[in-house]
């Protein structure tokens, strides 16, 4: 597993490369200048993975925690996963020491990818200023798409929090926090707890009370702060080896009619961005939803 400082250097290299490329917003803004509201741009990348942030304080999306499988470049039929042994299953040699030795192995088909969609209302004539329209697409439409993607990965119909095979942990045992207890439990299963998804309210409460968040991050745990985890809970797991994000490797931006209730005020031009993806867990025994 990469140390946090190595991961940050790698991200800096990615940022430097992306600054030399045309942004998704620029591509669409130029298409709109040429075709007006008939403009449709289909990208051969997932656009939530193609933007860089100018923020001095990063806030990472959930997709950055998980190995992404771009099915357009790396087609798959199946994925493997494990489960705990059935009650009464035969004893496995040294499973009391190496718990994972008793796990069962499975093969499942790659599930149907789910659409993730975001909408914005375009202020009148904004597209006439290409630079401003580019910024609006990049930092409103695609940022909203990133939020919708977090929902797909974390709490949507196929999201991590809705997977019944991921256990809940309410007791911290001999540790000072259930987060640390879960990290230990993952390692007792032969994995490494390399990721934490936590509500900002709890993240900053821990910051004010002590050094837990700093200690966890210095220990190499990648932290995602998001409203999509209920306050008082967090998700701890082996994201690097224990989960996959299947990705279509395709995106689209176009003008379209939004569903009712999308905006506070009806009317005006609506712009839609959409991607397709699905998260799966290979090692559900290496994830815990903890009560803080």
Segments from the language model and where they lie:
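Short loop/turn segments at secondary-structure transitions that flank enzyme active sites
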Residues: 84-87, 126, 147, 151, ...
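Helix N-cap / beta->alpha transition motif
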Residues: 42-48, 123, 198-202, 225, ...
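A generic N-terminal leader/anchor concept
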Residues: 1-31
């Amino acid at each position: 597993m990469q140390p946090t400082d190595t991961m940050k250097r790698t991200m800096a290299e990615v940022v430097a490369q992306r600054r030399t490329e045309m942004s998704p917003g620029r591509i669409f803004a130029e298409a709109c200048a040429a075709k007006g509201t008939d403009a449709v741009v289909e990208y051969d990348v997932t656009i939530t993975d193609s933007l860089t942030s100018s923020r001095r304080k990063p806030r990472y999306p959930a997709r950055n925690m998980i190995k992404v499988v771009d099915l357009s470049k790396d087609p798959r039929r199946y994925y493997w996963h494990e489960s705990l042994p059935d009650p009464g299953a035969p004893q496995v040699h040294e499973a009391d020491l190496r718990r994972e030795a008793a796990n069962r192995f499975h093969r499942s088909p790659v599930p149907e990818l789910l659409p993730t969609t975001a909408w914005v209302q375009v202020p009148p004539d904004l597209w006439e200023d290409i630079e401003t329209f580019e910024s609006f697409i990049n930092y409103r439409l695609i940022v909203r798409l990133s939020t919708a993607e977090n929902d797909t990965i974390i709490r949507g119909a196929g999201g991590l929090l809705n997977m019944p095979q991921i256990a809940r942990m309410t007791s911290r045992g001999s540790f000072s926090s259930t987060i640390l207890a879960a990290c230990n439990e993952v390692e007792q299963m032969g994995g490494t707890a390399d990721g934490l998804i936590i509500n900002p309210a709890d993240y900053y409460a821990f910051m004010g009370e002590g050094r837990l968040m700093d200690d966890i991050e210095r220990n190499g745990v990648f932290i995602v702060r998001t409203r999509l985890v209920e306050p008082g809970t967090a998700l701890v797991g082996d994201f690097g080896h224990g989960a996959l994000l299947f990705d279509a490797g395709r995106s689209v931006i176009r003008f379209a009619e939004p569903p009712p209730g999308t905006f506070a005020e009806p009317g005006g031009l609506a712009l839609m961005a959409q991607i397709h993806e699905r998260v799966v867990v290979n090692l559900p025994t290496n994830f815990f939803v903890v009560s803080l």
